[in-house]
Amino acid sequence: MLRITPLASAIVALLLGIEAYAAEETFDTHFMIGGMKDQQVANIRLDDNQPLPGQYDIDIYVNKQWRGKYEIIVKDNPQETCLSREVIKRLGINSDNFASGKQCLTFEQLVQGGSYTWDIGVFRLDFSVPQAWVEELESGYVPPENWERGINAFYTSYYVSQYYSDYKASGNSKSTYVRFNSGLNLLGWQLHSDASFSKTNNNPGVWKSNTLYLERGFAQLLGTLRVGDMYTSSDIFDSVRFSGVRLFRDMQMLPNSKQNFTPRVQGIAQSNALVTIEQNGFVVYQKEVPPGPFAITDLQLAGGGADLDVSVKEADGSVTTYLVPYAAVPNMLQPGVSKYDFAAGRSHIEGASKQSDFVQAGYQYGFNNLLTLYGGSMVANNYYAFTLGTGWNTRFGAISVDATKSHSKQDNGDVFDGQSYQIAYNKFVSQTSTRFGLAAWRYSSRDYRTFNDHVWANNKDNYRRDENDVYDIADYYQNDFGRKNSFSANMSQSLPEGWGSVSLSTLWRDYWGRSGSSKDYQLSYSNNWRRISYILAASQAYDENHHEEKRFNIFISIPFDWGDDVTTPRRQIYMSNSTTFDDQGFASNNTGLSGTVGSRDQFNYGVNLSYQNQGNETTAGANLTWNAPVATVNGSYSQSSTYRQAGASVSGGIVAWSGGVNLANRLSETFAVMNAPGIKDAYVNGQKYRTTNRNGVVVYDGMTPYRENHLMLDVSQSDSEAELRGNRKIAAPYRGAVVLVNFDTDQRKPWFIKALRADGQPLMFGYEVNDIHGHNIGVVGQGSQLFIRTNEVPPSVNVAIDKQQGLSCTITFGKEIDESRNYICQ
C-alpha cells in the first residue's frame, strides 16, 4: 500500500470539506506522491486521467495485459500526446491509420473506437482496443521484445550447514555441507557455477564442481546457448554430465500451455531431520526440516532425467531412504511447436578416468492435436544410439511409444548390440478427477547399452575407488547397469467435496543377470475436517533379496489463532501429531507445536516431543529459524537419554553491482535489485522480513523468467522522510538475469508550515508555492497550511493569492523553519 504523506492527508481532508473549489481547481494526484519536481505549474488539476505535462516511465496495458514499460512525453495538451510506429508495434496493436504516412498516433487514433485511461498514481496507462486490432497473448505471457537482459553483476547464493550428533553407545559424528550457486552477468552473458563442499567426521573434506558454464538466451531462436561443464537433456536419452557446448530450446520462453513439469519431493519427518537429495551422485539439496510433512518444490537441478535419491536422517541417527522417479512426461507438444536440443563435447562422468567424445541431437515436433514425432541420435567413439518415437493425444490420454537401438564396442573388443522400448501414459479424467501423473514402462534387451553404460564398462577393470568419490562404480552397477524392466506410475484421485484426496505411486525394477526385483509402493490419503487437516500414508518396499519393509503413518495438524490484525497482530500456532507403525506394530510418535512470531513475522519456531518404541526412548527437541533481511539462520537441538543432536545453518546471497554490494535473505537463479533511494525499511510483496536497507536497496528473488513479475514496495512501516512516487513496478527478465528496478523517490526534506496573509485571512487552498527561482516546491493545503519539499531551507517562498491579477505574497524564513510557528505571508 502507498504511504500516506502529509500532503496527501491535507488534500484528502480538504476534498471532504470544500466542494466549491473542487469544481474550479483540480489537483493532479501524481503530486500527492511526489509530483513533478522543479517544474512550474500554472493550473493544478485533481484528475488522474489528465497527467501534468512532462516525461514519464509508464507501464502500458492493452486489454488488461501488460505490454511493457515505455517512456512517454505528455504534451501541454494531453490530447496531442502520441506513440511512435515502433512502440505501437511492440504493443501488439495493428492500426490502419499508419497508411496515411503518420509516424505517430494520438491515443484517440490508436484505440480505434476504444478507450484509454491513466492511473498516474501508479504510472499506468490502459488501452482498451477492439480485439480485432490486437495480437492476442496468453495470460501472463510477455513477448520477447520486452524481455530484459538485466545489469552487470556478480552474485553468489550460499548455504552452510553443520550437523552434530553424540551417541553414548557409538561416539559422535559431525557432517558439514556447503553449497555455492554463483554467477557473473556481463554484457548479457551469464557465467554460472554450482559447487559444493562435504565433510564427514575426521575424513578430509572434498570440493566438487557440479556445473560451470557460460550462458546466453536468444529470443530469435527461443533457445539458450551454454558452453562449459553441464548436463545433456534427458528428454530422449539418459542425462550425461559433460564438457562442451549445448544449444537447446528453452520451453519457458513459450507460453505456459506449452511447457513441461518439475519434480516434487515430499515425505514426513519424525524429528528434527536432515533431508538430503542426490542426483547423479551429487548432493543437490540438503536442509534441516522440523517434524511433520515436508514438500520440496524449489529444486535447482542441473541434469534432467536422473532419478532423485532422497534420505531422511532423523535426530536419533536412523535413516530412511527412497527414490523419486524423475522422467519426462510423454513427449507431447502443441501443434506447430518444436523442441530442439544439440550437444557436443566430452563426457565428464564422476569417478570415471576414461571419458569419451560424443555428439547428441534431438528434435520433437507437434504435427497436430493428435500426433507428435520425436527422435534423436548419439554418436561417440565406438558407440552410437538412435531413437524414434511418437506421441499420441487420444481420448484415452496422452501416450508415447519409442524405440532405441544401441551399439557399443568396448576397449577389450566386446561388442554389444541391443534395443530398448518404452511406453508412457498421462491422463486426467475430469469426470472422476483422476490424474495419472506419469505411468511409464521400459524394456531393454540384455545387450542394450546407454552411453553411461558404455563409459562405465570401459572403466570397470581399472577403477580404483577414491575415498572422496561421492559415487562408487559399484553403486552404478548395483542400481543402473543392466536394467531389464522398469515401471513407474503416479496417480491421484480427488474425492467428492469434503472427502479429501488419494494418491498412489509405485516403482518396480528388475535386472539382467540378477534374480529378484526391487519394488516400492506409496499410498496416501489427505483431508480436512473444519480447520483440522490430516494425512494417512502407507508405504511398502521390497529389495532384490526379498527383504520387506512396511510403514504406516497418521499425521494430524490443528491450528489455533488470535489477534484481529488491527489492534493486535494476528498470530497462529499449529499443534501436530505424527504416529508411525512398522512391521512390528507401533514404532514412534511425535507431538509438536510450531508458529511464527516477530514484528515482521521473521521468526519461525517449533518444539516437539517424540517417543521411539524401539529402545523405549523419549526425545525432546526444538528448532528456530530467523528470516533476517540479509540472511536466513536456522538452529535445532534434540536430546534423549542416549544421544544429543544439534544442527545449524545459514543461507543467503551476496550481490555486487554498480550501485554497491548488497546482502540478501536468499537468491534464486533470476532476481531483482530494487532501488528506492532514501526509502529505508520498506518491505517487498508482503514479505515483512525482506526490507530495503538504509540506501533504499533490497534484493528480491523468486523472479519468473520471461513472465510478468509484479514488484511492490510497502512503506507503511518506514520512517524515512523521502517520498515514494509510485510503489509498483513490473519486470520480465531473461533466465538468469539480474534486473535493476528503480523506484522514483523525492528525497527533499518535507516541511509542514502554518501561514496566513497579512490581513489575517487564510491562503487560498490548492495554490502553488514557488521558490525564489519560480520553481514549484509545494502547495497550500487545508487550514492555510503549506506543504513544501526542499533540499535546503529556502530564504523565502512565494504563494499565489490572486492568479487572475498575478498577485502573490512572500514568506521569509531565517536559517531554519519552525513548524510550530505561524508565519505571515506579505
Language model features by range: what are they?
Residues 24-59, 67, 81, 86, ...:
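Flexible, glycine-rich linker and terminal segments associated
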Residues 342-360, 364:
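Outer-membrane beta-barrel transmembrane domain signature of Gram-negative proteins
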Residues 1-22:
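Gram-negative bacterial Sec-dependent N-terminal signal peptides
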Residues 372-385, 400:
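Beta-propeller domains
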